[in-house]
Amino acid sequence: MLTSYIRAAMRQAQYKILEDNTFYGEIQNFVGVYANEDTLEDCREELQEVLEGWILLGLRLGHYLPQVDGIRLDMVKEMA
C-alpha cells in the first residue's frame, strides 16, 4: 500500500527548470514536499526521499494525508 501511494504521488509530480538551470520539483497538495537539484534524475530521487519522510512524519503525528488515486494512508493508523 505504501509503495503504491508513493508511486501514485510521484506520478503527480511537476518539474520545471529554474533560471540557474537547476530542476525544481513539487507535488501538488503535499505541502512542503519539494526538491531542487542539478539534474532531473537527482531532483526526482530527492523529491521521493522528501515525500517518504513527509509521509512517515505525517503518520506519526496523525496528520491528514491526501488521497492519491484512491489510496488513503490515514487508514493505516486507524488499523494499527
Model-derived features: positions:
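Short aromatic-glycine-(Arg/Gly/Cys) micro-motifs in beta-strand/loop hairpins
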Residues: 12-30
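Short, charged, surface-exposed hinge/linker loops at domain edges
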Residues: 1-12, 45-80
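A short, exposed loop/beta-hairpin motif centered on an aromatic-Gly-Thr core
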Residues: 31-42
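Short secondary-structure boundary micro-motifs
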Residues: 17-21, 41-42, 48
